[in-house]
């Protein structure tokens, strides 16, 4: 089960094989926001408090496209014996 704070790897899409940490989860839609993955550009209007422009931020990705990475299980590569 994918939870906030865990490391995951992307299985499909333009960010395939990239790894990152889960920032946010959207349970009703089965989507997760991963740090540094699925970056999109948003156009922001100028307001009294904030300056407008183009802002890059992470977008949600479906959890079926993510694979949980187990840091404890990572070991050295093993050789097959003949």
Swiss-Prot record:
UniProt keyword terms in alphabetical order: Ribonucleoprotein, Ribosomal protein, RNA-binding, rRNA-binding
Record GO terms (molecular function): rRNA binding; structural constituent of ribosome
Gene3D superfamilies: 2.30.30.30
One Pfam family per UniProt: ribosomal_L24
GO cellular component, one term: ribosome
GO BP field: translation
InterPro entries: Rib_uL2_dom2, Ribosomal_uL24, Ribosomal_uL24_KOW, Translation_prot_SH3-like_sf
Family: Belongs to the universal ribosomal protein uL24 family.
Functional note: One of two assembly initiator proteins, it binds directly to the 5'-end of the 23S rRNA, where it nucleates assembly of the 50S subunit.
Listed PANTHER family: MITOCHONDRIAL RIBOSOMAL PROTEIN L24
Subunit structure: Part of the 50S ribosomal subunit.
Name this polypeptide is given: Large ribosomal subunit protein uL24
Organism field: Pelagibacter ubique (strain HTCC1062)
Annotated gene: rplX
